[in-house]
A protein has these predicted regions:
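Solvent-exposed, non-transmembrane regions of integral membrane proteins
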Residues: 1-638
Length: 638
């Protein structure tokens, strides 16, 4: 019975992993309805989850796991989450309601487009859009509604929901004319509560697990503490920007302002990305000229744009806007540097006079101009990769021979890691200050954040786990390589309203920390496969296990915190979006490595290392593959 339950549980989980992988591909090829019909809502899919949960719990009880409180709590928490999801699937309702200003309705449309009746009426009193300061990018959408007949008035906005009689209303969309609002409606009085209880139990159990005695994690930690392996290191040279050929012209051009990337920024941002010649050539197409309307709202125009009627009534202003870019081009062509500077300084003076309320502060401009000159980590990634490869090979040789590096070598490596970490901290900090948002969205941001975590891991762990140095530098090098391919000055844009949530910050940080740790495990697996000594392979397996537990727990925490954020933002804590599906796949795949006690192959060091190398493909697909190939709601981060 015990053996049967074990095979049923792990077998069902393995089949579910394959089904979810296939479902994301089918969704891309044949559409979401087909994927839900064939996979997510199919009887087989539900049965497999039930078998995995029930058989797994029975096996744990028969194996004596209840004696280990937190280990049992981990698995029980997952079972409670599945129970809540089943209740939501069977009894929950969700859809949307479309209201025009002044309109009252007592029904909404379900996801299958059938009507559903509300036990009350809802009226839209007003709808409004807030914009980022000096930008046309929305910062929030607001619907003022009244529930009738009670007359309860509430305001719904992004990440600010309304709850009424067991129903929840979320700001989902709006009409193009700004006179209508579309609200998402969710009615799931039991499923959400059960699922949240599972999340809480899971979180408490993950924290308690690290204090639990006689676990595989504790055994691996003790083995690693007695290892003799160590690693070495070299030197860092920070990158230096090249000087411009026509320094004064480039400086004057860079100090102007431009409306670019849905925000007002120094022209230097565009200049560093495109180069001086291209910037001058496209000057008439750049939004350099702010104009205020009768209400005082400032909009930015290019010389080639259709200008407001008021400009044509002011001949001097019209001439200034239309002719200034042409004068700059002509002066550059003729080598008249003084003429170029005169026109550029005139444009800047006009900008400061007309748009003083929306242009960035001098301190923020200085920060951005510094940032764009150091944002591309080309020298840093090449250094990290070179050192990582050398130390990786050298470390493998030393492990095989059971030798240590001198302590001064490890200290030298830590100094280099510190310099890289300080550089990354400066770049991330400057970008954060300029944009006003943390490094949580976009490939450049996330890659730099992963490199930051990798170098921080070196600084924190190199004394106890010397192998962290080559592994950390390899990971930092690869992630900075990917970041450098995003352009000289990666675009800074205001965040979409739905992304302006502190839960998103914690969610992304948790996910990126887990991905960083999985990357370290993958590199450690490569070394484990390469070394000829069986004892060395076992030592490296222990290192991987010590890293694997916090990595899996961070991924689990991040995934379910993302579900809470999604539920708050748009009323659905799980939508089988390709990104969240692959995050779940990754979590399940890596969880197999933590069950060596039940799964004999994972007690074999060579198999374990090969598995961790292959498993990292799931991380790559989750982050890169989904954004580039599969799409879905999370593709905003691409």
């Amino acid at each position: 019975m015990k053996r049967t339950c074990k095979y049923l549980s792990y077998g069902a989980a393995a089949v579910l992993i394959v089904m979810m992988m296939a479902a994301t591909v089918v969704e891309k090829l044949h559409g979401t309805p087909v994927a839900f019909q064939w996979f997510y809502h199919s009887p087989l899919f539900l049965i497999l989850w039930a078998v995995a949960a029930v058989a797994g719990l029975v096996y744990l009880v028969m194996a004596g796991t209840p004696k280990r409180l937190f280990t049992m709590g981990l698995h029980l928490g997952l079972a409670v989450i599945l129970a809540g999801a089943l209740v939501t699937h069977l009894f929950g309702e969700s859809g949307e309601i479309h209201l025009r200003e002044g309109e009252t309705l007592a029904s909404f449309e379900l996801e299958d487009e059938s009507p559903a009746t509300l036990p009350f009426s809802i009226r839209l009193d007003a709808f409004a859009i807030d914009y980022h300061h000096g930008s046309r990018m929305p910062s929030d959408y607001r619907s003022d509604i009244t529930f009738l007949p009670e007359g309860t008035a509430v305001r719904i906005s992004m990440n600010n929901i309304a709850k009424y009689r067991g129903y929840r209303f979320y700001q989902a969309d709006y009409d193009e004319d700004g006179k209508g609002s579309i609200l998402a409606v969710s009615h799931d009085p039991w499923g959400v509560g059960i699922t949240y209880a599972g999340y809480l139990l899971l979180l408490l159990s993950m924290i308690g697990f690290f204090f639990q005695k006689d676990t595989v994690f504790r055994q691996a930690l003790r083995r690693v503490a007695t290892m003799t392996a160590a690693v070495a290191f070299l030197v860092l040279v920070p990158s230096v920007s090249a000087s411009a050929s026509t320094r004064d012209v480039k400086k004057a051009l860079g100090e102007m302002y431009v409306y670019y990337g849905h925000r007002v920024c120094p022209f230097d941002t565009y200049l560093q990305e495109k180069g001086l010649d291209a910037a001058v050539e496209s000057l008439d197409k750049m939004k350099l000229f702010p104009l205020a309307d009768s209400t005082g709202k400032v909009s930015w125009y290019a010389a080639a744009d259709d200008l407001p009627e008021s400009v044509y009534e002011d001949q001097d202003l019209w001439t200034f806007i239309r002719k200034s870019p042409e004068l700059v081009k002509e002066s550059v062509s003729s080598g008249d540097e003084a003429g170029v500077l005169q026109v550029l300084n005139g444009i800047k003076a006009y900008q400061e006079k007309t748009a003083s309320s929306v242009i960035p502060s001098p301190r923020k401009v200085k920060a951005e101009r510094t940032y764009i000159r150091i944002a591309r980590p080309k020298a840093q990634f090449m250094l990290c990769l070179a050192l990582g490869i050398v130390l990786f090979v050298l470390g493998g040789v030393l492990i095989t021979r059971k030798k240590k590096f001198p302590s001064w070598v490890l200290i030298a490596g830590a100094v280099i890691a510190l310099l890289i970490w300080l550089y990354l901290s400066l770049v991330i900090g400057l970008r954060w200050y300029v944009s006003g948002t943390g490094p949580y969205v976009g490939r450049y941001n996330v890659m730099m954040l992963m490199a930051w975590f990798a170098t921080l891991a070196i600084l924190l762990l190199y004394k106890r786990f010397p192998l962290i140095e080559p592994l950390g530098f390899l990971l930092a090098g690869f992630t900075m390589l990917l970041a450098s391919r995003e352009g000289v000055s990666p675009q800074i844009m205001p965040l979409m309203p739905v992304l302006q949530s502190p839960l998103l910050s914690i969610h992304v940080l948790s996910m990126m920390m887990s991905y960083t740790l999985f990357g370290l495990v993958a590199f450690n697996g490569i070394m484990g496969v390469a070394v000829p000594s069986a004892e060395a392979r076992e030592d490296l397996r222990s290192v991987s296990l010590v890293v694997m537990y916090p990595a899996v727990f961070l991924l689990t925490f991040g995934t379910f915190l993302g579900a809470v954020w999604a539920n708050i933002s748009w009323g659905s804590y799980w939508a089988w979006d390709p990104k969240e599906t692959w995050a779940l796949v990754t979590m399940l795949v890596y969880s197999f490595t933590l069950h060596g006690g039940a799964l004999k192959p994972f007690r074999n060091a060579r198999f374990f290392h090969w598995f961790t190398i292959a498993a990292f493909l799931c991380v790559l697909i989750t982050y890169f593959g989904v954004n580039l190939l599969l799409g879905g709601m999370h593709s905003y981060g691409s």
